[in-house]
Amino acid sequence: MKRVVHCVAVWLAVACGLVHPGWAVAAETITRTVRVGVTRGVHAEILDAVKRVAATRGLGVDIVEFDDASRVDTALADGKIDAASFEDAQRLEATRTAKGYALSAVAPTVTLPMALYSRKLRSLNELQPGATVAIPADPRGMARALVLLQNDTLVTLRAKAGLHATLRDVTGNRLALKFVALRRDRLHAALDSAAFVAIDSDDATRMGLQPARDSINLEDARSPYANVLTVRDADRTKPWVAQLVAAYHSDDVAHFILTRYQDSVRRPW
């Protein structure tokens, strides 16, 4: 009898417009709740959209926000959270190697693209031979920038360099570009002198730049630096993982990403 009364109450609430129909269904059907760690900002905002979709499909999502990204994988490995969405595949692999965590990437999430910014050029077609360009000096940033430039056919890299390329791995440079490697905090100032500057998404945001609006070219959505959804190795085949991935890759979340960020946050799925 109590069950009948409860169901009638839910129906009346929906009928009267007090509760969104999807919410009522979710309240009735959620069978598992998972804790997902994210960093504040883009990843937390997107996961909130994922949470709404997942609830309508029977999966509850508790969002756990971290101010310090270095703590997220540790929390996941220690079982304090069930999944994480905050880092790209290359950073995850580096953490696995350094700390021995048994963590696996189960799906791509979004790409926060490195992009090329310029105060002198409207497109790469205007780039002149011998121009000076600025790229990050740190190993990860330099490699990412060089891979981007290779994809733009501006340079050719030694095949074995892979995602660890340095300027020594440049075997072809068709416009004889002059490269200046700078600390990340000096890249913005280089816009005054360089033909273009390669800046990653996090740094660009801090500088008030938006990749889709302000760059002359940006990284492909299916970059090897796409961010990933991560779980413990022991959990990767559990049903809730597939549910979480499906919610993230849903049309509703795709629409949210496009309308909220345009192309400054890119979708690799």
Task: Outline where the language-model segments fall.
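Ligand-binding "clamshell"
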Residues: 94-106, 119-121, 193, 198, ...
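Periplasmic-binding protein-like
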Residues: 108-118, 143-150, 205-269
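Short, polar/charged alpha-helical segment
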Residues: 40-62
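Short, well-ordered beta-strand elements
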Residues: 30-41, 61-65, 132-133
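A conserved helix-loop-strand patch within extracytoplasmic ligand-binding domains
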Residues: 106-156, 254
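Beta->alpha turn/N-cap motifs
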Residues: 41, 65-69, 79-93, 110, ...
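Short helix-initiation/N-cap motifs at beta->coil->alpha
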Residues: 63-74, 161-189
